[in-house]
Amino acid sequence: MRVLNVSGEPMHFKAGQPLAELHPITEVVGAIPSEEGKDGYKAVIQEMISGVDPGVDEDTKTRLAQLLNEFTPVLSRNETDMGLTNIVMHRIDTADAEPTRQALRRQSKPASEAIDQMVPELLRAGLIEPSVSPWAANIVVVKKKDGSARCCIDYRQLNAVTKKDRYPLPRTDSCLDSMNGSRWFSTFDLRSAYHQVSIHPLDREKTSFICHRESYQYRTMPFGLCNAGATFQRLMDVVLNGLSLQICL
């Protein structure tokens, strides 16, 4: 069993001291049977290899393909194929504020069609669940640069009664200073990174949103919450503990 100290401080254990407890799995999030299997990973790897600079020799491409095949579980095959962590869970502290509830807004036909497409996709991915909540926010459909529709949640009223998290974000100058003398740089991108962060079960009902059919709430962190950036930075600091500003930014 691998053990990770995420506290940032040394920890000491006595011989024979229990380190963990095992419990049966009671809930699985996002475990959707995939029809893609190995073929799905193969297609993703082929696409990545095809994007390599033409000046890279075939031997290097082959070794890269072997490396990617070795770590296929960390590759995303499609928009709903993503990870999930509860190392850090997002909290929404509203103290004793009354639940905020917006009246259902009228949506245009194209917007309603976009919502009808989005909701089932989020349900299948395990990102949302049906909600019976006193909180309610509306969906706002906006156009992306490519002309397609994106569904966002109007959390302005919720944010107004949420206690702000002042967790510090990295300073740009410190990040630039840490790269002094470095020659090679790599970047890693997460598929829908916020959606890979769990929302604490006690706070899920506060993310409830309404549409022309039902109300739903998020199981994972959506965009639009005022403290989402702080939560994600806290998660990255835990995951990269001991590496940040040394070999990782």
What is the predicted role of each segment?
Residues L4-G16, I25-L249:
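Retroelement reverse transcriptase polymerase core
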